[in-house]
Design a protein with these regions (language model features):
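Short, charged, amphipathic alpha-helical segments
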Residues: 7, 144, 215, 303, ...
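Mobile late-domain/C-terminal helix-loop "cap" segments
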Residues: 269-319
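Short, amphipathic C-terminal "tail helix"
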Residues: 308, 321-341
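Mg2+-dependent prenyl diphosphate-binding active-site environment of isoprenoid biosynthetic enzymes
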Residues: 35-269, 334
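Hydrophobic, well-ordered secondary-structure elements that form the walls
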Residues: 258, 312, 329
Length: 341
């Protein structure tokens, strides 16, 4: 596979990447009251946060503010809060999944120990509300509305994580496509799309119509983002996945691909056996992917993600938005299902 060509959205992310990184660093620099607190808490959390992905979540929050007539900078505390949430959630998620690699590096619980990693994740989650509360540029009523969005996001994400982990723990293979969509919407779509956009639009002074349209756009694109993540874990490359390749099979994840394939009686028992085995054998992992291809499940998931992209674009079609921001949102929807890492 080849890398997709540069798009307006990827150019936007690259343009503002250093800006949001520099702002995020301010939440860790000089915060510790002793060298040991720095060593055991702020340094590892700062390093984890700095080892960034593309920063699309905070940057689309800031973009949403401009889309409804506000300023880009006005939403940066909410943007940072969402990135703090992701740091905490990912640190804890890696512990729950016994993960090995995150963003090309060993997971924090492997380098710092489980106890300190949990504590770092706890601090990151606490910083979600603190970051917004401490922003002197936001009016109190706006802070309350944004905090409502953020707390709802946290609850929904934790609910989705409960389903994801619970199905594996209980050996559940009776999961339907609708079950998967509910889980992935909760676990990923709120914090990867809906909440960043809604919070940014609130800060930017958007109307109820604008806020809800951007929320709907974010739910659709956020779900498409998760489905593409599932696909990349299976059929991407080990290098593009930062060595975290086909781990969804090893961990027995009920992805959309797996759930669809399980509905094929010809392969149900074999898929169930592989997903239940915890195997890291490359031959077994390749066999699972072969089955997913034979059942048409990979194509099914890709088509579903494309359909979500179309629904997302329709959600903002008739809503008044800044033209440049609209162009970036449409490009974002395409990027979420075209990216290769």
């Amino acid at each position: 596979m080849r890398e997709p060509v540069s798009s307006p959205f990827t150019s936007f992310l690259a343009q503002h990447f250093d800006q949001i990184n520099d702002y995020l660093a301010t939440f860790f620099d000089g915060q510790a009251t002793s060298a040991d607190i720095e060593r055991y808490l702020y340094t590892p959390l700062s390093a984890f946060t700095a080892n960034a992905g593309k920063r699309h979540r905070p940057l689309i929050c800031m973009l949403a503010a401009t889309a409804v007539g506000g300023s880009f900078e006005s939403a940066r505390s909410a943007a940072a809060a969402i990135e703090h949430f992701q740091s905490g959630a990912l640190i804890h998620d890696d512990i729950a999944d016994n993960g090995q690699i995150r963003r090309g590096k060993p997971c924090m619980h492997l380098t710092e120990g489980t106890g300190l990693a949990i504590n770092c994740g706890d601090l990151a989650l606490t910083m979600v509300t603190k970051t917004v509360l401490d922003d002197p540029t936001l009016e109190s009523d706006v802070k309350l509305r944004v905090l409502h969005e953020l707390t709802e996001m946290i609850v929904r994400t934790i609910e989705g994580q409960a389903l994801d982990l619970g199905w594996v723990r209980d050996g559940r293979f009776d999961i339907s496509v609708d079950d998967y969509l509910d889980m992935a919407t909760h676990k990923t779509a709120y914090y990867s799309g809906a909440t960043p956009l809604a919070a940014g639009a609130i800060i930017g002074g958007g109307s109820d119509e604008q806020i809800e349209a951007l929320r709907a756009f974010g739910l659709h694109t956020g779900l498409a983002f998760q489905i593409q993540d599932d696909l990349l874990n299976l059929i991407g490359t080990k290098e593009a996945a930062n060595k975290d390749f086909r781990t969804d099979i090893t961990e027995g994840k009920r992805t959309l691909v797996a759930v669809h394939a399980l509905s094929d009686e010809r392969y149900h028992d074999e898929i169930e056996a592989i997903l239940s085995s915890g195997t890291e054998d490359p031959a077994q992992l390749a066999r699972a992917v072969e089955i997913f291809q034979e059942t048409g499940s990979i194509d099914y998931a890709h088509t579903y993600a494309l359909d979500l992209t179309a629904k997302a674009k329709a959600a903002i079609e008739d809503v008044s938005l800044d033209p440049h921001a609209r162009e970036l949102f449409l490009s974002m929807a395409d990027f979420f299902v075209e990216r290769l890492n």
